[in-house]
Design a protein with these regions (language model features):
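Conserved glycine-rich acetyl-CoA-binding loop
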Residues: 25, 38-39, 51-65, 73-74, ...
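C-terminal "cap" of GNAT-fold acetyltransferases
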Residues: 77-79, 84-122
Length: 122
């Protein structure tokens, strides 16, 4: 459930969530989270969303870059993510950022619908 995400991010050390907006209109968001079961040096890129109007503007790349920078500041050396093959453009962007495919999931994210797993050293 997303009902209490603000409280979850606010109360979890080494987590962060960022939103992108223009003229008061929400365009997207992305965050990092030390997902349960991941190694201590690894966080997850989570809740990466863009509105349809924001796609193709480079905003996703900016948000990923910012998340990777903050992850490094927080002391993480790897960033993990889970996605789906249907999100071809997103997967392509992750590959361009240097994320590599994994054969199985890491941690206990609870994302049963995601069947692609990727990781990047930072």
């Amino acid at each position: 459930s997303t009902d209490h995400l603000f409280e979850l991010f606010e109360s979890t050390p080494r987590s962060a969530y960022f939103i992108a907006e223009k003229n008061g209109i929400l365009l997207g968001g992305a965050g990092i989270f030390p997902t349960e079961g991941l190694p201590d040096d690894t966080c997850e890129l989570v809740k990466m969303y863009l509105t349809s109007k924001a796609r193709g503007m480079g905003l996703g790349r900016k948000m990923i870059t910012h998340c990777l920078e903050v992850a490094a500041i927080e002391g993480f050396s790897q960033v993990y993510l889970e996605t789906m093959p249907e999100l071809k453009k997103a997967v392509s962007v992750y590959e361009k950022f240097g994320f590599a495919f994994l054969p199985a999931p890491m941690g206990n994210s609870g994302h049963c619908g995601c069947d692609m797993w990727m990781i990047k050293k930072i």
